[in-house]
């Protein structure tokens, strides 16, 4: 308040006003700052003062034949004086209005074809249903998501060749259209865009949107397919969410879904064959999804799912180092371990053979309703920071992390026999046996885990064995965060192809 008063007093003195309005800016550093380089330093200001001028626009001289000097109200549309430094004409913003109202019209037949992605988006929104709005704490996780619905899955290079061939067919330069989808799209687009009057550069931009998958690393709670991402700003805030059902599907989401289903079926069938790797590769090569060979889709599609990763690894493609356990995606962000087989005794004196991971490791755990950061050593949970939608979701994440830690107190908490089977009536492996057991009832596990006093840390709270929050005590090593925990970012480590192939046969 004081500062404002002081400024008011200063401005009331005529000398101040004179200094501010009449003094020239002649400090070299300032002049340099605003005049070096082609980049506009203050676009908003520039636009403001340009529009305050009578003729802020320059146009080609031909405009003088196409637009009258004055409009119906007698306002001048262009000035006879040339623009300094070029032979262009100075034009008023009113000329734009005149042109929009009275200028030549052209055929609009190509607009829906070129701006196809926008027209389709409008249709999806028109037929979508919104509401109701719920107010609750939103746990958002940054995930890599697809942001332009309705695209084909070409690589940037493939799309570039198609665009050059469609938009600039007479330009020089080698263009090799090899894949089937490239040839089909090129033929289709050339026919669609015959005699198109829309600026070629605009057509090229719009084609890029249609052909290439664009992904961003965004905080999301809920649906991650592209038709949900396009309305992210309407469906979730910091403390609210709005229900939304999209008004239509798009090809890329269908392909992602079909790819996961196909990969799972292939992996399942390959597992029981005499040569799993060979049969998996053969099936990948002979399968088509939406008329495109599955191997071509696998090369371009970034979908991260266990079965899809196995197929990619078998083909020698790079895969990210993530795996699933108990409905959570685990990504190792630090550390390393070696596997050793050990025999352990449960609380029911049943012997289990488990593969123990020896070494210090850090993971991010990402599930549908909860996320966590886990730090562990050999058969010991060091720290678990978990965040979730509700008590139930947080409990699920804690159980999975406790089982994954392979701690002795977890194995000793088993009551009764472990004899869970899968759908094919085969016994589950020991780690999944333990998980199923505690997912049914985790009371003993939580009671036996132990509790510890906690420090007061901003945004963190403790959780007791009965899953109630506490500011004083918490399950040993476990804390609940009020903020979401991010999925590992795009800079994640990637498993090299030569290694992934070997891992793949082991996974099968």
Curated annotation (Swiss-Prot):
Pfam families for this protein: Flu_PB2_1st (PF20947), Flu_PB2_2nd (PF20948), Flu_PB2_3rd (PF20949), Flu_PB2_4th (PF20950), Flu_PB2_5th (PF00604)
Any single Gene Ontology cellular-component annotation: host cell mitochondrion
InterPro entries per the UniProt record, alphabetical: Flu_PB2_2nd, Flu_PB2_CAP-bd, Flu_PB2_middle, Flu_PB2_N, PB2_helical
Subcellular localization: Host mitochondrion; Host cytoplasm, Host cytosol
Keywords, ordered alphabetically: Host cytoplasm, Host mitochondrion
Keyword Ribonucleoprotein applies: no
Main location: host cell
Record bears the keyword Cell division: no
Membrane-spanning intervals of the chain: none
Stated role: May participate in the inhibition of type I interferon induction through inhibition of the host mitochondrial antiviral signaling protein MAVS. The knockout of PB2-S1 has no detectable effects on laboratory infected mice.
Listed name of the protein: PB2-S1
Organism in which the protein naturally occurs: Influenza A virus (strain A/Goose/Guangdong/1/1996 H5N1 genotype Gs/Gd)
């Amino acid at each position: 308040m004081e500062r404002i008063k002081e400024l008011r007093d200063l401005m009331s003195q005529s000398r101040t006003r004179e200094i501010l309005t009449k003094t020239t800016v002649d400090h070299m550093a300032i002049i340099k700052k605003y005049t070096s380089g082609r980049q506009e330093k203050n676009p908003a200001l520039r636009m403001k003062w340009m529009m305050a001028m009578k003729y802020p626009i320059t146009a080609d001289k031909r405009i003088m034949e196409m637009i009258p000097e004055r409009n119906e109200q007698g306002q001048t549309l262009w000035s006879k004086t040339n623009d300094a430094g070029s032979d262009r004409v100075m034009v008023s913003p009113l000329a734009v209005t005149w042109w929009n109202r009275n200028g030549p019209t052209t055929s609009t037949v190509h607009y829906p074809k070129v701006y196809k992605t926008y027209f389709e988006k409008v249709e999806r929104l028109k037929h979508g249903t919104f509401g109701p709005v719920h107010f609750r704490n939103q746990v958002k996780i940054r995930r890599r998501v697809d942001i332009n619905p309705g695209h084909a899955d070409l690589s940037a290079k493939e799309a570039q060749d198609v665009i050059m061939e469609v938009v600039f067919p007479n330009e020089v330069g080698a263009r090799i259209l090899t894949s089937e989808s490239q040839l089909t799209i090129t033929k289709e687009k050339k026919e669609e865009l015959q005699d198109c009057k829309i600026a070629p550069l605009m057509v090229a931009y719009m084609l890029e949107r249609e052909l290439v998958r664009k992904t961003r690393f965004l905080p999301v709670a809920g649906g991650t397919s592209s038709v949900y991402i396009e309305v992210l700003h309407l469906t979730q805030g910091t403390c609210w969410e709005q229900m939304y059902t999209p008004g239509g599907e798009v090809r890329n989401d269908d392909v992602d879904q079909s790819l996961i289903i196909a990969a799972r079926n292939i992996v399942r069938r390959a597992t029981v064959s005499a040569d799993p790797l060979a049969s998996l590769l053969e099936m990948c090569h002979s399968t088509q999804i939406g008329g495109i060979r599955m191997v071509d889709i696998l090369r371009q599609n970034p979908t991260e799912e266990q079965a899809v990763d196995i197929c990619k690894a078998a083909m020698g493609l790079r895969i990210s180092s993530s795996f699933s356990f108990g409905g959570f995606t685990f990504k190792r962000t630090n550390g390393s371990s070696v596997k050793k087989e050990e025999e352990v005794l449960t609380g029911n004196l049943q012997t289990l053979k488990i593969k123990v991971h020896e070494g210090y490791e850090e993971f991010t755990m990402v599930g549908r309703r909860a996320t966590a950061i886990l730090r562990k050593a050999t058969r010991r949970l060091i720290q678990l920071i978990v965040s979730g939608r509700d008590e139930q979701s947080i409990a699920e994440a804690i159980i999975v992390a406790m089982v994954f830690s392979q701690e002795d107190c977890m194995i000793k908490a088993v009551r009764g026999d472990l004899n869970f089977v899968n759908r094919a009536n085969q016994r589950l492996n020991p780690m999944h046996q333990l998980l199923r057991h505690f997912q049914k009832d985790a009371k003993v596990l939580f009671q036996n885990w132990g509790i510890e006093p906690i420090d007061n840390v901003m945004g963190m709270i403790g959780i007791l064995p009965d899953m109630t929050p506490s500011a004083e005590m918490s399950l040993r090593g476990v804390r609940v965060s009020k903020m979401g925990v991010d999925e590992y970012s795009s800079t994640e480590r990637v498993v090299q192809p030569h290694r992934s192939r070997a891992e793949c046969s082991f996974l099968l």
